[in-house]
UniProtKB/Swiss-Prot annotation:
GO terms for cellular component: extracellular exosome; lysosomal membrane; membrane; plasma membrane. Residues 1-36, 94-119, 189-193, 284-297, 360-390, 438-466, 762-914 are cytoplasmic. Interacts with SLC12A1. May be an inhibitor of SLC12A1. Seems to correspond to a subunit of a multimeric transport system and thus, additional subunits may be required for its function. May play a role in lysosomal ion flux and osmoregulation. The chain crosses the membrane at residues 37-57, 73-93, 120-140, 168-188, 194-214, 263-283, 298-318, 339-359, 391-411, 417-437, 467-487, 741-761. Keywords: Cell membrane, Glycoprotein, Lysosome, Membrane, Phosphoprotein, Transmembrane, Transmembrane helix, Transport. Residues 847-858 have a biased composition (Gly residues). Glycans are attached at residues 228, 243. The keyword Transmembrane helix applies. It comes from the Eukaryota. It is linked to Defects in SLC12A9 may play a role in a neurodevelopmental disorder characterized by hypotonia, failure to thrive, moderate to severe developmental delay and intellectual disability, pale hair, eyebrows and eyelashes, and variable presence of seizures, congenital heart defects, skeletal, and brain anomalies. It comes from Homo sapiens (Human). This is Solute carrier family 12 member 9.
Amino acid sequence: MASESSPLLAYRLLGEEGVALPANGAGGPGGASARKLSTFLGVVVPTVLSMFSIVVFLRIGFVVGHAGLLQALAMLLVAYFILALTVLSVCAIATNGAVQGGGAYFMISRTLGPEVGGSIGLMFYLANVCGCAVSLLGLVESVLDVFGADATGPSGLRVLPQGYGWNLLYGSLLLGLVGGVCTLGAGLYARASFLTFLLVSGSLASVLISFVAVGPRDIRLTPRPGPNGSSLPPRFGHFTGFNSSTLKDNLGAGYAEDYTTGAVMNFASVFAVLFNGCTGIMAGANMSGELKDPSRAIPLGTIVAVAYTFFVYVLLFFLSSFTCDRTLLQEDYGFFRAISLWPPLVLIGIYATALSASMSSLIGASRILHALARDDLFGVILAPAKVVSRGGNPWAAVLYSWGLVQLVLLAGKLNTLAAVVTVFYLVAYAAVDLSCLSLEWASAPNFRPTFSLFSWHTCLLGVASCLLMMFLISPGAAGGSLLLMGLLAALLTARGGPSSWGYVSQALLFHQVRKYLLRLDVRKDHVKFWRPQLLLLVGNPRGALPLLRLANQLKKGGLYVLGHVTLGDLDSLPSDPVQPQYGAWLSLVDRAQVKAFVDLTLSPSVRQGAQHLLRISGLGGMKPNTLVLGFYDDAPPQDHFLTDPAFSEPADSTREGSSPALSTLFPPPRAPGSPRALNPQDYVATVADALKMNKNVVLARASGALPPERLSRGSGGTSQLHHVDVWPLNLLRPRGGPGYVDVCGLFLLQMATILGMVPAWHSARLRIFLCLGPREAPGAAEGRLRALLSQLRIRAEVQEVVWGEGAGAGEPEAEEEGDFVNSGRGDAEAEALARSANALVRAQQGRGTGGGPGGPEGGDAEGPITALTFLYLPRPPADPARYPRYLALLETLTRDLGPTLLVHGVTPVTCTDL
């Protein structure tokens, strides 16, 4: 965790002039020794070559011939608009911080997290691997179109034998050449790319000059077989030179049959071919680990490359429409050779473009693979790809990728691979747009890119357009890619990954939570929508684990805050001892699988700390309304960490960098007879403080005896039938008659009903006990209670029990604390009443027999026992001197009752209105 002494920047401000100092953690290809490429050689050249590919020479006639000039320009504008949206996102992310090796993968993973970044990074890697194979297969086909021997044998220039084995051999030889260049490092790759760029530029220049310099001519088209295999007379296309009639004829669309496939073209199919050729905008970003200044080079170089290729495509569209008739455009996609002043130069351009695309894909794939291996997302599978040379060249990743490309070449399915490659590229582009969109929506202060020509609108459009293009190009491949991404993300989530990168999801959640918390107006609260919002005060969680889980069940969709008071005075301490404890408590919440917030405080006493937490815990309209405490008794604390399966062994203890076991982060339970942090006086005072602050109070006793299946997160399926007993009457001072249920009694009913909504308690039966005096007739009070339960939609079994004279039922209502502030006679009566009430409750639980005076004959020892008992918690006496006596009465009342919740409610929580 960063401290006051941590540097604000990850590099030294003072250093040797003109020397770039790497950020912490940069190594390998991201280190200073490997950063050699300029903007032009590292970004512009590979991006231009990738965006041209073979389309610029072999598909211009296809697009213009079928779509016409106007629709072709519209397609080009739409395609580049989609790409430009992603380019804007790339520029924004690249100028917001130091970009290391891995290009698009690095940007996505450091924004969306390792799960999404790793899954898309692997898919982008596979796309580059397949893209390299597609380029090589296309190059082999182009070579064999000119130099391949036909069925009659070699003749003239057609001397190369053909067939699957020969094609695989040619592809493997070309792959060896490409792999050798990439293995020797980025420097040789940059020089080879620059040489290729010169060849392609020279070839394009010769084509552009030929459009102007060559006069009109007829060009013989490839003959087509006629019906029944008969030969047709030769057909010719016409190069007219600059002619307005030719332009007019080529303005509109004229979709026809593709002579290479026999399929009739339409707007979508032509647009897909054009868009396939325009992808490749990440070629420069993939070299981020070798760039001298990636934050400047990536945006500048990518924008220049996109603008340059767009201009060349537009120029070629216009020149083709002005000079070539539709027959030539539709029947001879390689017509550039026929009109060129020197046709071999066009062939050189075609071969150089395909070769450069394969080199760009292979070296880009190796850099992505090395970044994935360095981040250790896929474990030992990619471990060999971490190896680099002394100069930082990831040669092992190149060889790794070379082997995969060789496997793809064995398949030889060019057309199938092309669609999958494009879809995988689009998934990566959409993820980059989503990353930028997330950063923009999160409104984090540290997201301030120097490139400002973007907004959330452009990012959102980029995501939507990339997804649309995926399904337009290949619906099957698009659906499969999204499914694969989901499976990989699930795998990485299950495996776990580094958490030090930061998650934009956390920033987005903060932004949304803050917005909705501001809308949560406490002045609009209504009892219809009341829900429990609990503050559980815990001294040592090792002894309170069952209560921790029980409180999690009682909250039922409400707020749950886990509070702890550390004793001390900040004036006498060198630092705050509370802050280092948060990690341990958050790990406790994760391991216990409870949905709780953690709030810790430092205070000279537990009582004052509880007051602090009651006042300041929560935020806005989400503040605790109920205090939950463990019961204060002399029972020795149990160490539940030793018996609970979730805590007996540290999770992920075998993973490098995993946190230590929780048993080492919390002290052992208090030994019997040792001093306690809280005395009985302060304990009762804390209860009184909560009631004064208008908070409900729940005291939990013997929660460790709860059946384990009732504390589980499952459905609570068990062969043992349990009861949940509710006594909605103050057993220490019955008042108001047998049918009286006050606000506190209704709160008991509500909490018991909420517990029954939890799956683990579905099978437990709710029983409500109605106490009658020895002279009261049964039936009438039960009917009134059943009517009340019906109005409150509470399903429960009502049982009437007869209590003896000591209950005092039906006495006039008086001050609640009267029994505790009167003479000694009141204490004696209260003690007797507590013993009588305890015997009565025990008799109904099936835990024993013998009620108080005039009590029942005994409980049903053969029937189901009570898993949990809800009792009415009397208000503490007004005189603090009587707090210990009050606590002693509560101890007598709940002695040997098993798991018990003493509940006192101060606010209405039930409503019969719609």
